[in-house]
C-alpha cells in the first residue's frame, strides 16, 4: 500500500477523517483479505514516518476495537523517526517480488513515478483515479505494462456499484449517444484535507470528474468516442482559504458516434459544497437516441439521524462499516471493497498461471481501456490553462487515440 491518507487509513491531520471514510478503505479491506488468506505480508509506504504511531493508534480505535479477528500488523516505510522521505516507497517496493500486488493512493502528480517503479519490478498494480495525469504518461505506462506482462488498472469502484453497472448495460441499448450531464461535489473541509496539493499539483476535475468521465467512457465506449474538450472554472472560495485552486470545474466534451452523429457531455465537480446529508453529492443524466437514464448515487432511500451526527443519507452499498451481531466486519459485498478484492483475485490468478493480464481487459479498469479517461482529464486541464481553448483528441486511422492538440 503506497499512501497513508484518507482512503488508505482514514487518518488525516492527526485524527479520523471528517468524511464517510474515517476508518479508511484500503487498509481495512487488506486486513480482511488477509484474514481470508488471500493476501499475506502487508507493507505501507508514506513520506512521513512520524505519522505511523498515530496511524496505528487510529487503526486500533476504528478497526481493531470495532471488529473481531482482524490482524492490523503491517510493515511501514520510512521508519517512525523519519520526518520526510518521499522515496520511501522505493524501499518498500524493493521488499516485494515479481507478481506481488501494489495499491497506490497518493497525490495525483506522484502516480506515474510510483507506477513506473512498480511495473519495472514486475508487480501488478492498482492506482487511484486518475491513474496518471497526462496522456503521454498513460501511453508510456501502458507500453511498460505490456512489456513486463503485468496487470495495471485504475481503482474505480463505480464499476462495481450495482446501479451504475445496470445503467451501463442499459445504456448500450439506448441507441446513439446524445447528451450526458454529471455532477459530483464534496464539502469545503476537503480543501483542508488536501491542502498539501489542492491547486498546486492537481485539481478538483482530476479528483472528482474522473468518476463520471470514466463511467461515460465505459458505458458508451463501444459505439462513441470523445473528440473535443473545453473547460471552464469558478473561483473564489478556495482562494479565500489561502488555497490556489479552482472551486468548481466543468468540462464540455464533444463526442462522435460511430454512425457519424454527435453527442455532448458536461462533467462538473466541486469541492466547496456545504456540509449536508452526504459527503459526496453525485448524480448523472444520460440521454440516448432511444431512451434516457437518471441516477442519484448519493441517495439510496436510506436515511439515519443521530444525536452525534444529525441527519444523513447512508450508503452501505459502498462500504458497510457497522459490525454484525458477532462483532465481525461484514462489508465484503460493498463496491468499495469489491474493487480491491477483484484486483487481488486477478493478481493471484495470474500468479497461479490460471490467467494472463490481457484477460482482464474489459473486466477491470485496465490501463489499456482507461486511455480516454486520462485524455479527457488532461485535455480539460490544458483547456483551463489556455483560457478555455478547445483541445482535440487525435485518433489514428484505426481509431486509436494517439495525442492531444490545442
Would you name each region that the model predicts?
Residues 1-121, 139, 143-148:
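N-terminal glycine-/serine-/threonine-rich beta1-alpha1-beta2 phosphate-ribose binding loop
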Residues 5, 151-153, 158-246, 251, ...:
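Predominantly a Rossmann-like dinucleotide-binding segment in NAD(P)-dependent oxidoreductases
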Residues 40, 353-373:
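Glycine- and charged-residue-rich phosphate/anionic-cofactor binding loop of Rossmann-like
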Residues 131-136, 160-162:
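Conserved PLP phosphate-binding loop immediately N-terminal to the Schiff-base lysine helix
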Residues 207-309, 329-332, 336-355, 377-381, ...:
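Contiguous beta-strand/loop segments that form the cofactor/metal-binding neighborhood of enzyme cores
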Amino acid at each position: 500500500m503506497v499512501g497513508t491518507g484518507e482512503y488508505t487509513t482514514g487518518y488525516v491531520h492527526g485524527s479520523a477523517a471528517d468524511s464517510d471514510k474515517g476508518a479508511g478503505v484500503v487498509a481495512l479491506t487488506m486486513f480482511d483479505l488477509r484474514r481470508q488468506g488471500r493476501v499475506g505480508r502487508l507493507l505501507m509506504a508514506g513520506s512521513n514516518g512520524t505519522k505511523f504511531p498515530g496511524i496505528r493508534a487510529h487503526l486500533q480505535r476504528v478497526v481493531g476495537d470495532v471488529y473481531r479477528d482482524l490482524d492490523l500488523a503491517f510493515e511501514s516505510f520510512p521508519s517512525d523517526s523519519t520526518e520526510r522521505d518521499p522515496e520511501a516507497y522505493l524501499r518498500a517496493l524493493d521488499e516485494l517480488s515479481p507478481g506481488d500486488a501494489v495499491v497506490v493512493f497518493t497525490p495525483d502528480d506522484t502516480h506515474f513515478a510510483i507506477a513506473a517503479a512498480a511495473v519495472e519490478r514486475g508487480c501488478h498494480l492498482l492506482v487511484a483515479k486518475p491513474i496518471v495525469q497526462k496522456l503521454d504518461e498513460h501511453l508510456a505506462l501502458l507500453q511498460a505494462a505490456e512489456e513486463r506482462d503485468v496487470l495495471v488498472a485504475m481503482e474505480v469502484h463505480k464499476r462495481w456499484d450495482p446501479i451504475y453497472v445496470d445503467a451501463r448495460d442499459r445504456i448500450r441499448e439506448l441507441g446513439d449517444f446524445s447528451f450526458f450531464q454529471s455532477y459530483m461535489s464534496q464539502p469545503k473541509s476537503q480543501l483542508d484535507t488536501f491542502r498539501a496539493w489542492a491547486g498546486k499539483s492537481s485539481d478538483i476535475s482530476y479528483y472528482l470528474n474522473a468518476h463520471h468521465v470514466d463511467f461515460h467512457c465505459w458505458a458508451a465506449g463501444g459505439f462513441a468516442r470523445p473528440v473535443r474538450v473545453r473547460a471552464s472554472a469558478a473561483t473564489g472560495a478556495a482562494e479565500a482559504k489561502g488555497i490556489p485552486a479552482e472551486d468548481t470545474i466543468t468540462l464540455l466534451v464533444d463526442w462522435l458516434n460511430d454512425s457519424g452523429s454527435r453527442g455532448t457531455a458536461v462533467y462538473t465537480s466541486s469541492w466547496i459544497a456545504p456540509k449536508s446529508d452526504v459527503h459526496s453529492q453525485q448524480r448523472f443524466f444520460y440521454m440516448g437516441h432511444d431512451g434516457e437514464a437518471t441516477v442519484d448515487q448519493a441517495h439510496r432511500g436510506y436515511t439515519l439521524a443521530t444525536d452525534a451526527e444529525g441527519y444523513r443519507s447512508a450508503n452501505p452499498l459502498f462500504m458497510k462499516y457497522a459490525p454484525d451481531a458477532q462483532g465481525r466486519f461484514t462489508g465484503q459485498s460493498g463496491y468499495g471493497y469489491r474493487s480491491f478484492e477483484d484486483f487481488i483475485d486477478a493478481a493471484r490468478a495470474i500468479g497461479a498461471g490460471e490467467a494472463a493480464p490481457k484477460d482482464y481487459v474489459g473486466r477491470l479498469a485496465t490501463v489499456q481501456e482507461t486511455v480516454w479517461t486520462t485524455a479527457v482529464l488532461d485535455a480539460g486541464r490544458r483547456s483551463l490553462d489556455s483560457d478555455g481553448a478547445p483541445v482535440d483528441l487525435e485518433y489514428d486511422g484505426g481509431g486509436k487515440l494517439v495525442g492531444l492538440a490545442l
